[in-house]
């Protein structure tokens, strides 16, 4: 069965059910329409779309220009003398020149004693001389010295606990066979090499700049030459045996400073520019979705039958496509600018990195959008995150690898808290990946970053903590995990946070069988309260009659809002509304602002879930089967659901497909409703060129498409010129024959002309129910006479004259010199005729001192409305 059909009888409408397969087709249809709409709006908004997609080009070109035409000292200071460098204290009141290990090697100690003697440095043993980590209480104020450590692992632990306190660590690996101490071979030497004459050691140099704005000295050569000098001096002074030749000195150096290539700015600040180019789409996504929420576009489409799930899926696919496109543009422009980061990296590593980051930020945007209701808030939050993230990138890019070593390899509560918090920030993992890749590609073309490097262990020299620096691949996986985390959070909070439409589910909604379609939602009923008005009581009785087969039956519909932190302050928007509406009837809702009219329509269209009660639309419950209700209903919302970038015809094509109208009937129906609202000649013009009245007429046309059985019209003629308003009124009257139309308006004249039945609501309660004549007869005063007194002094005389002339006359109200009186139509016609004759004679008398003018009319609906509101107010006092 098609999702659209012209129902010929009520039984077909009531029994109509859609199969699982048709439901799937309907979901895909909605997805296709939404994607088409997003594409069309993006193409028409070509300027903003261009900024969103092409922004990476601008940022990378700026980076390219800075890196090629910038100035500054790009190479660190290098020293080449054979003296041991002198340490400087930075964050702590102490510093050490060198740590060396192992402490159980007599030969290593002898060589370092010679180094200390040459450079006037003493040897301190850890922990006996220094105190235990992390306190090192015995070293406060110490400037210089050689610290003897048990192993290189202890040296690493030392550096992690106290960064920038020591220059380097030396780890001896082997001692030659002929080495002597006091003229004899060393006893218990664990490093003795039996088959060679080489002395091997490894130098681990601290290349962490204590000040990211300062240049970092390269002490590796100085320390190595100082140790070589100490070895040679030791052999010449302590070993005087000519048969023992000087050893072959072999050494290695870890953490050697990588000299910046020609484009130093691209290496240091590249992450900031790559981040900025990728984040523009994040801000645009926040704006575009919040715009549809703020302007009720999403709400309007949902009322017309749109699947909410497909709405969000369409935006996810749209943002996913833009994210992939932006990532490709970033990589292509980076390659075109010959930046080493891109030239030296595997393409798949780059596309995965940039795509996962932009997609993860889109997931963050969807999560934030569950709390955002306006474009102003969206732009403010988006720009705030962009600026904070830029500062974040600036600091992290400047500090490089050091910041990740501090975060992951510092054993403190602060570091632990930082690891937990930063894990949930996508830009942190993005920066980590960029830093890892940059550390390799900075040596391009000598080194390139390969796909296999994603699993490279980044913990140089091992780790002494339970935590380790994640591999690049792990950081990428964290981005993938955050996409899932924020997507699930967005899905969850979208259900429990009230949006513009006011709907929300309980926090445990996902465990309810009704959410997954395994059971129907239960309807909560409350006892029927007593109503003074007999017509209201009759309407309730008829609505509750089990034999009632009216197309629309409302039974005890109620809606209350309870404040989270003030549960006693419950606001009752609608209180027990019960009535039924027959086919071919226009029901008009009247009431002041906030009386519950729009809330009632919101419940009947499924935007709001009733607190109690239910409504049946051709037998389908708005609580348990809202999808079936939306297939046969349509809405003219209070706010136009229109996109400025689309034409009227495109809107009607969108909603006709949404309603499931067959393709062969679609064009004829579109043309029909365009003719009905007089928009045919301008149907291909963009909505941005329409006046407010034209937009309102188009909203009425959209509601009429698809031959709906029930149409909800929320103030349909607002902003329409008198001629078009008259035409719309005639249109509504002409289409009502086989339909039910629910109308709300503040225009009493409009309601009086259109409505077959009128309900006046006051503070959420149905105060009265009936047609225009019934209400006027019941609440009106029959005739209404307005008299303009000549002076304030004559007012009492005028009031006395009128009340004495007409039995049962009531003085209704006064406005300055204008007095209003009312009297019932049951008064004898001769008395009325004589009264009007007297009024005419008095006003024509030039010497009269009572009145200037007078007029007479029947009681209007305005009078009825004012009296009903006044009576209701008296009851609540």
Curated annotation (Swiss-Prot):
It is found in: Membrane. The gene is abcA1. Residues 552-788 form the ABC transporter domain. Pfam families: ABC2_membrane_3, ABC_tran. Belongs to the ABC transporter superfamily. ABCA family. Coiled coil: none annotated. ATP binds at residues 591-598. It is a multi-pass membrane protein. Its main location: membrane. Keywords: ATP-binding, Membrane, Nucleotide-binding, Transmembrane, Transmembrane helix, Transport. This is ABC transporter A family member 1. It comes from Dictyostelium discoideum.
């Amino acid at each position: 069965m098609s999702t659209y059909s012209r129902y010929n009888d009520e039984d077909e409408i009531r029994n109509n059910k859609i199969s699982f397969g048709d439901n799937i087709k309907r979901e895909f249809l909605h997805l296709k329409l939404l994607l088409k709409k997003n594409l069309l709006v993006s193409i028409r908004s070509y300027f903003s779309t261009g900024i969103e997609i092409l922004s990476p080009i601008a940022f990378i070109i700026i980076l390219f220009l800075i890196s090629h035409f910038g100035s500054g000292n790009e190479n660190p200071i290098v020293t080449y003398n054979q003296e041991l460098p002198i340490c400087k204290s930075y964050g702590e009141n102490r510093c050490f020149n060198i740590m060396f290990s192992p402490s159980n090697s007599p030969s290593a100690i002898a060589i370092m004693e010679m180094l200390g003697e040459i450079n006037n440095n003493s040897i301190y043993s850890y922990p006996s001389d220094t105190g235990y980590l992390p306190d090192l209480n015995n070293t406060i104020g110490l400037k210089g010295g050689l610290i003897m450590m048990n192993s290189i692992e202890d040296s690493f632990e030392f550096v992690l606990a106290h960064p920038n306190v020591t220059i380097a660590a030396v780890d001896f690996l082997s001692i030659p066979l002929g080495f002597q101490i006091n003229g004899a071979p060393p006893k218990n030497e664990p490093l003795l090499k039996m088959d060679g004459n080489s002395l091997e050691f490894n130098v681990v140099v601290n290349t962490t700049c204590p000040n990211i704005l300062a240049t970092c000295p390269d002490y590796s050569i100085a320390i190595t030459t100082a140790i070589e000098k100490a070895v040679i001096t030791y052999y010449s002074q302590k070993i005087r045996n000519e048969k023992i030749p000087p050893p072959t000195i072999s050494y290695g150096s870890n953490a050697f400073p990588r000299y910046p290539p020609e484009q130093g700015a691209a290496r240091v600040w590249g992450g900031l520019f790559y981040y900025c180019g990728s984040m523009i789409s994040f801000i645009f996504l926040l704006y575009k979705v919040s715009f549809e929420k703020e302007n009720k576009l999403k709400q309007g489409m949902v009322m017309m039958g749109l699947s909410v799930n497909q709405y969000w899926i369409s935006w996810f696919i749209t943002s996913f496509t833009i994210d992939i496109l932006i990532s490709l543009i970033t990589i292509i422009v980076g390659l075109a600018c010959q930046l080493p980061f891109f030239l030296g990296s595997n393409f798949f590593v780059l596309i995965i990195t940039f795509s996962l980051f932009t997609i993860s930020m889109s997931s963050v945007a969807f999560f934030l959008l569950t709390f955002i209701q306006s474009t102003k808030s969206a732009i403010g939050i988006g720009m705030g995150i962009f600026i904070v993230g830029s500062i974040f990138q600036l600091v992290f890019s400047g500090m490089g690898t050091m910041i990740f070593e501090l975060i992951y390899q510092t054993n403190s509560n602060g570091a632990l808290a930082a690891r937990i918090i930063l894990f949930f920030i996508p830009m942190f993992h993005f920066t980590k990946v960029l830093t890892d890749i940059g550390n390799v590609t900075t040596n391009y073309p000598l080194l390139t970053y390969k796909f296999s490097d994603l699993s490279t262990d980044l913990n140089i020299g091992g780790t002494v903590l339970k935590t380790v620096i994640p591999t690049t691949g792990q950081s990428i996986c964290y981005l993938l995990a955050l996409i899932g985390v924020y997507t699930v959070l967005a899905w969850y909070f979208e259900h429990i946070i009230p949006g513009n439409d006011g709907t929300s589910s309980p926090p445990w909604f996902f465990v309810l069988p009704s959410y997954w379609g395994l059971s129907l939602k239960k309807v909560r009923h409350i006892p029927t309260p007593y109503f003074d008005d007999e017509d209201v009581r009759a309407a309730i009785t008829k609505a509750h009659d089990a034999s009632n087969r009216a197309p629309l039956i409302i039974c005890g519909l109620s809606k209350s809002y309870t404040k989270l932190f003030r549960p006693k302050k419950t606001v009752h928007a609608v209180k027990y509304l019960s009535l039924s509406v027959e086919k071919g009837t226009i029901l008009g809702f009247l009431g002041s602002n906030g009386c519950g009219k729009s809330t009632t329509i919101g419940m009947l269209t499924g935007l709001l879930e009733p607190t109690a009660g239910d409504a049946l639309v051709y037998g389908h419950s708005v609580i348990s089967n809202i999808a079936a209700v939306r297939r046969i209903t349509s809405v003219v919302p209070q706010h136009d659901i229109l996109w400025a970038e689309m034409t009227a015809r495109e809107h009607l094509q969108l909603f006709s497909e949404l309603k499931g109208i067959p393709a062969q009937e679609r064009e004829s129906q579109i043309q029909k409703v365009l003719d009905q609202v007089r928009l045919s000649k301008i149907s291909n013009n963009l909505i941005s060129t329409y006046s407010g009245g034209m937009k309102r007429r188009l909203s009425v046309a959209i509601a009429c498409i698809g031959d709906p059985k029930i149409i909800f019209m929320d103030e349909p003629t607002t902003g329409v010129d008198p001629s078009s308003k008259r035409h719309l009124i005639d249109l509504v009257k002409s289409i009502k024959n086989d339909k039910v139309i629910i109308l709300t308006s503040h225009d009493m004249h409009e309601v009086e002309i259109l409505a077959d039945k009128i309900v006046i609501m006051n503070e959420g309660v149905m105060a009265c129910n009936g047609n225009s004549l019934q209400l006027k007869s019941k609440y009106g005063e029959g005739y209404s006479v307005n008299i303009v007194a000549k002076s304030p002094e004559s007012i009492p005389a005028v009031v006395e004259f009128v009340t004495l002339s007409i039995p049962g006359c009531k003085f209704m109200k006064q406005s300055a010199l204008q007095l209003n009186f009312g009297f019932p139509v049951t008064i004898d016609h001769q008395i009325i005729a004589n009264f009007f004759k007297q009024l005419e004679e008095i006003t024509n008398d030039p010497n009269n001192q009572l009145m200037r003018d007078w007029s007479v009319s029947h009681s209007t609906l305005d009078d009825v409305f004012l009296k009903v509101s006044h009576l209701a107010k008296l009851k609540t006092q």
